[in-house]
Amino acid sequence: DKDAKTLTVTDRGIGMTADEVERYINQIAFSSAEEFMEKYKNQAIIGHFGLGFYSAFMVADKVEIFTRSYKEGAKTVHWSCEGSPEYEMEETTEQRDRGTTIVLHLSADTLEYGEDSKVEELLRKYCRFLPVPIAFGKVKEWKDGKYVDTNKDNIINNIAPLWTVKPTEITAEQYKDCLLYTSPSPRDGL
């Protein structure tokens, strides 16, 4: 939301309970994170222990999490932090679908991350081959002399890249599509 100066990421996954937020989000930040990072600095720990989550504070002054677990009777959990060891967390009666929403309140010097073009560029660069569909906006179609959004999600990644398929099962059209999708100058190889 460019006007609100926020970047919001939502999934429809299994969500988290308050105990899980405490364990997975607060565990590193409030249990000697510097010591932990020093100890494991030479190991590939990105994607573990919630460390990637804390990189959000590189672009945000404040981060909020709204999450609701798939577990029966689960309540929505709201977690909020402004980058210090202090945070707020509460269970609310707000009805939300199962899953997690993370809201980054962008800092003044990182507002470019509120621009659709910048977000799409980063998603295509870093999420291009993730095994789950990543939707960003809606597919646009030409109607009455202008592009308009449809109800169809704009999936920006390829969840089944060619290297996951047996070569004997790949068609010439699939090779061509892969080249167009991955090459900076796709016409060179056609």
Task: List each language-model region with its residue ranges.
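GHKL (Bergerat-fold) ATPase N-terminal catalytic module, capturing the glycine-rich phosphate-binding loop
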Residues: D1-A108, E112-G114, E121, R128
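Short, exposed beta-strand "edge-strand" segments with a Pro/Gly-rich flavor and a Y/T-containing core
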Residues: T10-M16, F30, P161-I170, G189
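Secondary-structure boundary/capping residues
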Residues: E34, V132-A135, G189
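ATP-binding catalytic core of ATPases
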Residues: E86-G145, D149-L180
